[in-house]
Amino acid sequence: MGEIQNSKNNDKIISSNGIFLFNFINQLGGEAFILPTAKDDIKSLTNILDEANDLDLIISSGGASVGDYDIVQRALEKNNFELLFSRIAMRPGKPLFFGLLEKIPFLGLPGNPVSTGVCSIIFLTKIIQKFFGRQVSENIAMMRVNCSLDKNDHRKDFIRSKVIKDINNDYIVEPFSKQDSSQISLFAKAQGFIIREPHENKIKKGTKVPVLLISENI
């Protein structure tokens, strides 16, 4: 991974997740700290975790799936980690996991920037709301969709979308044509996520669908 300050390194993926999470947490009222980037070995990650034992919440980004270099959970297992849930049937964000590291809540986010963003909005927002004793809530509105949607598969789908007004000045939702989790620019432009339940049937154009609103301008 390449850091944003070293963006001239064209052969590397820019490491944007830490900056996104830092700002996202601060906007929610938390106080975020960016720990050093761990190398792809258990010892390096364990040393960093030792520095985080006075935090209220620890978040990792990347290394949450089961590949050879995904060593986060293996490192945690050596440090008395209690896994509470993992591998969520959702898109994007399947590799997410959550548990307790010596009683400190630990949220493991996927490394893909779009997956990190979607999972932060859905999961991290609620965690921070609970920390502050706020009512856990989501801003969900029913809107007509301006295109048909195919039958969904076994995963809950969060479709990145924009919200526009029709000729009657009513809000309607328009999904982006590209939903690949590599589309960071489209995630940045998203105003909401159409929520599709697992195995949901095909939806006709004009049908009202639940939309998780993420823009303050709607």
Could you tell me what each predicted segment is?
Residues L57-V72:
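Glycine-rich beta-strand-to-loop/alpha-helix junction loops that act as flexible
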Residues S7-N10, I48, V72-L76, I122-F123:
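Short, glycine/charged-enriched secondary-structure capping and boundary segments
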Residues M1-S60:
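Phosphate-binding glycine-rich loops and their immediate beta-loop-alpha structural context
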Residues I4-N6, Y69-I71, V118, G206:
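Short glycine-/acidic-enriched loop or helix-start segments at secondary-structure transitions
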Residues T37-D40, G63-A64, I88-P95:
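Short, ordered loop/turn segments at secondary-structure junctions
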Residues A75-I218:
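Flexible glycine/proline-rich
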Residues N10-G18, I42-L45, S65, Y69, ...:
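Generic structural signal for well-ordered, non-membrane alpha-helical segments
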